[in-house]
Amino acid sequence: MRFVTVLFLTTALVAFPAVKATVHTECFNYFMKKDGCVWSAADDRTRCNATNGKPPFQGVERFQHHNQKTLQRRYTSEDTNTSFAMRDGPGICGNYSTNQPGACLWVGSEQVYGNDTATAGWLNGAKTSNCGKQLYVQRKGRPDKPFYVPVLDGCSFYSKNVTVGCTQIALSNKTFYDLEPTAQELKQGYLGDLIWDFNNEAGTKGQNAPV
């Protein structure tokens, strides 16, 4: 009987291997710490509420005060000069053409492709989990005209600061022009009023959830 019990436990361990915890990026951890939730996260317990912008309910034994003014609903490029058009590349996520829809997100504090998952902004060379995930990008005040594009690469945005880097986005030439830049924006080389996020706000498209 003892032999049978040991055999059963061994078989069970093989059949049900240990589940590894998700290693999150610098940006995911930054927003989780700042807001108590992350927009479009896969887990209902950590995803910001798409209806009212509040962190998920934590239970009566864990009261937390959250200032709604600091809770960023989606990410905006307003008052930055970083929503520029990308060039062709091989990149972190592979080869791509700037003539296809797509976007580039912050590589993190290492400022290079990187070989350390702990320093990935939204992605880097060692942490590619967010590659290919679909974002939506729209002009401020134009919720009727979103564009859905994949993450194609990582960009430094010349910043090592999570408070700056995590909200930045660069665009393929195709998406840049799809967003109808003004004459001034074409002259300056960047768009100044974008709103974007991973396309899983309601939790129904988990394949696009950021990590």
Sequence positions of predicted segments:
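Secreted/periplasmic proteins
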Residues: 2-7, 12-170, 174, 178-211
